[in-house]
């Protein structure tokens, strides 16, 4: 315990860390992370990967493109780069190794492509930015603004993958027929609809980002149970993993709030 008479600065820092995350808007972060974990366990991530593979796997270095596109789709649904890296990476790393891609290359692609989730809505970072702006920037406006840079970042990563794939002679995958593309799209349709429901609802003003995150959890949970890839007995582990990820993210936010106050107080 601290002597507040002698250490007022440390007391203030602790207060700033606590008040920094005392916001209703920040409740969206743990819920979006939970939605991402449910999608990972519930087979939703697999369906997104298969749909992405049907679109771009025939290009040189095809599985790397699949990784990027699947990360963009998953990040656009879960709102979390961590969730995208975990869900897509846990599936794609082994698949890419089986196809002869170096593990370092597949890991690099997964790490860089997951950052598109920081920009493509619903993004946890944009929610934090809206909060830090003191209300001058709306979440809906930031979400609309995040699409173009997020897509451009994904295309830039794909462009570099094309250069590496051609240089190193990575193999092409099998070209999917229109029927196969339609089949995988149909299987991923309800997963993709989550993006429309969440972002569309926020932009249209039907619900807030926090309310949208709860809807995302309920939608993902029902979908996972319908698909049958996740059982009720797995929910405690899903909640625990989500809590661990949330703890890391929220700790970063509260310490950044304290550092921001410290810089302001010291006139840096």
Placement of each model-derived feature along the sequence:
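Alpha-helical transmembrane segments of multi-pass membrane transport proteins
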Residues: 1-268
């Amino acid at each position: 315990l601290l002597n507040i008479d002698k250490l007022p600065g440390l007391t203030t820092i602790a207060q700033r860390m606590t008040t920094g995350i005392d916001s209703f808007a920040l409740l969206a972060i743990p819920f979006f992370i939970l939605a991402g974990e449910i999608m990972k366990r519930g087979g939703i991530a697999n369906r997104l990967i298969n749909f992405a593979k049907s679109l771009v796997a025939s290009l040189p270095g095809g599985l790397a493109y699949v990784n990027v596109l699947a990360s963009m789709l998953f990040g656009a649904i879960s709102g979390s780069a961590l969730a995208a890296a975990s869900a897509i990476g846990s599936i794609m790393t082994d698949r890419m190794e089986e196809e002869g891609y170096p593990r370092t290359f597949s890991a690099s692609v997964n790490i860089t492509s997951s950052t598109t989730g920081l920009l493509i809505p619903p993004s946890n970072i944009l929610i934090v930015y809206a909060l830090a702006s003191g209300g001058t920037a709306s979440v809906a406006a930031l979400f609309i603004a995040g699409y173009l840079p997020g897509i451009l970042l994904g295309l830039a990563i794909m462009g570099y993958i094309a250069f590496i794939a051609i240089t190193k002679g990575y193999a092409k995958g099998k070209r999917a027929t229109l029927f196969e593309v339609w089949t995988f799209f149909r299987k991923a349709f309800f997963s993709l609809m989550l993006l429309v429901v969440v972002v569309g609802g926020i932009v249209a003003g039907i619900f807030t980002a926090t309310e949208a995150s709860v809807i995302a959890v309920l939608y993902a949970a029902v979908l996972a149970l319908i698909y049958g890839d996740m059982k009720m007995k797995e929910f405690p582990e899903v909640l625990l993993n989500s809590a661990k990820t949330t703890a890391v993210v929220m700790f970063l936010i509260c310490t950044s709030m304290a550092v921001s106050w410290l810089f302001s107080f010291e006139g840096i």
